[in-house]
């Protein structure tokens, strides 16, 4: 564990190898995905954090990735299919598939061995759609050591409201406004995909499969995209009721992107990982 304050202190120049930021390529669904790996200074092997961005990915949390690196974690940020210049088409299902593929690939000997990574210690940290994806991916992969959802979007809490035509239309229109960096989809297609998935995308149902892992949920009280009364508080209650014994949860007085709580977010996430992912640096 690093002893200096990772938010204001660069690593010692005596640490070797030096920190680096290589671009990586992953394959998912026949398409090539671009990733940026933030490798800490020092011999490692370094624990891995895959940082999952939201829809469409305006906030990609590179500041969090840099803070994670200074704290001793190798942080990966990547783009899903059909987003930000990547090939293929965007869909919620493709996001889930891409996250699973990348999470597996980063731990292979080819990548982990080449970049001083510890494949035995991996966490997922996601924002918004990325929070949903982090929890869903961790529930399906028992080897993921810890998971954090920040302003997570709970599809299962929203889809039942689509029986109201006005609500459904509102989501179609809201999604349409965010499609510029995405390809091959529409607001109607995204809402229809949510309806087809139904309760299978309810995050509350994941409690039994997350009960043996540390889980961090961060809500935001000034959030109009994922209001904490809908997306955060009910999920906390569901995970406490099951229970998920190593659940930690917070609500920050901030907007969806935590625009004025970036330092607090970094400290909260890294404190959680330091205690729960057993960093041994």
Spans of model-derived segments:
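Serine-hydrolase catalytic-loop signature spanning alpha/beta hydrolases and amidase-signature enzymes
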Residues: 54-60, 75
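Short beta-strand element of the alpha/beta-hydrolase
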Residues: 45-54
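Alpha/beta-hydrolase fold nucleophile elbow
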Residues: 113-128
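Serine-hydrolase catalytic core
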Residues: 187-274
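N-terminal cap/lid segment of alpha/beta-hydrolase-fold proteins
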Residues: 2-44
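Conserved alpha/beta-hydrolase
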Residues: 65-87
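Hydrolase active-site cap/lid region
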Residues: 136-189, 213, 228
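Alpha/beta-hydrolase active-site loop
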Residues: 90-115
């Amino acid at each position: 564990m690093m002893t200096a304050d990772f938010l204001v202190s660069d690593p010692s120049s005596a640490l070797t190898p030096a920190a680096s930021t290589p671009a990586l390529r992953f394959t998912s669904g026949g398409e090539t995905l671009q990733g940026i790996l933030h490798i800490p200074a020092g011999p490692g092997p370094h624990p891995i954090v895959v940082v999952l961005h939201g829809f469409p990915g305006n906030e990609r949390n590179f500041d969090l990735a840099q803070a994670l690196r200074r704290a001793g974690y190798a942080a990966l940020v990547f783009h899903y299919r059909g987003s930000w210049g990547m090939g293929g088409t965007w869909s919620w299902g493709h996001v889930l598939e891409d996250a699973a593929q990348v999470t597996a690939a980063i731990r292979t000997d080819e990548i982990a061995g080449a970049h001083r990574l510890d494949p035995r210690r991996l966490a997922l940290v996601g924002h918004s759609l990325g929070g949903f994806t982090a929890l869903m991916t961790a529930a399906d992969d028992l080897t993921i050591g810890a998971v954090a959802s920040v302003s997570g979007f709970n599809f299962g809490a929203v889809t039942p409201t689509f029986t109201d035509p006005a609500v459904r239309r509102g989501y179609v229109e809201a999604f349409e406004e965010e499609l510029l960096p995405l390809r091959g989809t529409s607001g109607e297609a995204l809402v229809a995909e949510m309806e087809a998935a139904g309760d299978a995308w309810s995050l509350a149902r994941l409690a039994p499969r997350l009960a043996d892992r540390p889980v961090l949920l961060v809500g935001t009280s000034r959030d109009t995209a994922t209001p904490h009364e809908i997306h955060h508080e009910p999920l906390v209650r569901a995970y406490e009721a099951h229970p998920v014994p190593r659940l930690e949860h917070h609500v920050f007085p901030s907007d969806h992107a935590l625009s004025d709580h970036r330092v607090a977010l970094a400290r909260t996430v890294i404190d959680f990982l330091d205690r729960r992912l057993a960093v041994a640096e």
